[in-house]
């Protein structure tokens, strides 16, 4: 595969990017040699990883569509990554053509390719921002232009919080975003785990990128104070594996790769935040 014709401003083509590695695994072309080398090392070291990433992508789409079918018309997709198949706006606008989506990522490559996500109707925007600064993001003019925080929001944080170390309080960050929404909003979150991964594979993941896999109990903490939903018909409300959430046949969907990510969808309850 040849390199991109030009390196977008602010992009370091010599440093791997999780978004570009993910893009490569899903068949995209917005990646560089360093990303492909890392991806091939991971593919060899963790044979079920590609299955895991597709399972995670499937959860993202099912969660977004579920929210849209339950009345959510505005979405905040944090850690959105590069454009790929069935992007959030493409999925939810099949339910409501006027649904609005704001994509957020800290990789300049995402912003450079934002044109693929922007539509003539003006229902989508892409923001280059660090999720560790909720105040800056929640007050960004592009977010406020499309999202009315006085109305329910679908917050999607899939495959992103395991890149935030404990020292940055990832649980507090998620709580901050949800505290800015009104009751009736939803959180859809997935998070990498190594609980079902052999030690050698777990070490390979840590050697390749700065990543903090977490346990089921740790992932469940992201939903503290929210009303966790049942992941599929007949189940109790719980955090589960990405292949199972929303699956028509959970037993068939329970692949080894899907167990590399925990996930959940939860409803915001309680009182609305005070506005200045």
Residue ranges and their predicted role:
Residues 153-157, 180-192:
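Conserved beta-strand signature within the Rossmann-like core of class I S-adenosyl-L-methionine
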Residues 240-276:
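Core SAM-dependent methyltransferase catalytic element
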């Amino acid at each position: 595969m040849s390199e991109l014709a030009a390196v977008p401003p602010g992009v370091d083509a010599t440093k791997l990017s999780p978004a570009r590695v993910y893009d490569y695994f899903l068949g995209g072309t917005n990646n560089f040699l360093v990303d492909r080398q890392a991806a091939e090392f991971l593919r060899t070291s963790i044979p079920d990883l590609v299955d895991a990433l597709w399972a995670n992508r499937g959860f993202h789409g099912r969660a977004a569509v579920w929210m849209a079918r339950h009345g959510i018309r505005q979405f905040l997709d944090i850690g959105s990554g590069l454009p790929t198949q069935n992007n959030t706006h493409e999925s939810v606008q099949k339910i409501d053509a006027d649904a609005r989506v704001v994509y957020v990522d800290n990789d300049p490559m995402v912003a450079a390719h934002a044109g693929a996500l922007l539509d003539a109707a003006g229902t989508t925007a892409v923001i280059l921002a660090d999720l560790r600064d909720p105040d800056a993001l929640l007050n960004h003019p592009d977010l406020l232009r499309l999202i009315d925080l006085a109305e329910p929001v679908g917050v999607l944080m899939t495959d992103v919080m395991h890149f935030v170390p404990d020292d940055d309080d990832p649980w507090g960050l998620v709580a901050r975003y949800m505290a800015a929404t009104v009751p009736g909003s939803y959180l859809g979150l997935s998070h990498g785990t190594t609980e079902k991964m052999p030690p050698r594979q777990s070490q390979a993941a840590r050697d390749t990128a700065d990543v903090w896999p977490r346990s089921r109990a740790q992932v469940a903490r992201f939903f503290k104070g929210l009303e966790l939903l049942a992941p599929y018909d007949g189940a109790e409300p719980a955090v589960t594996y990405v292949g199972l959430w929303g699956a028509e046949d959970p037993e068939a969907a329970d692949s080894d790769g899907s167990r590399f990510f925990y996930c959940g969808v939860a409803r915001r309850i309680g009182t609305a935040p005070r506005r200045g």
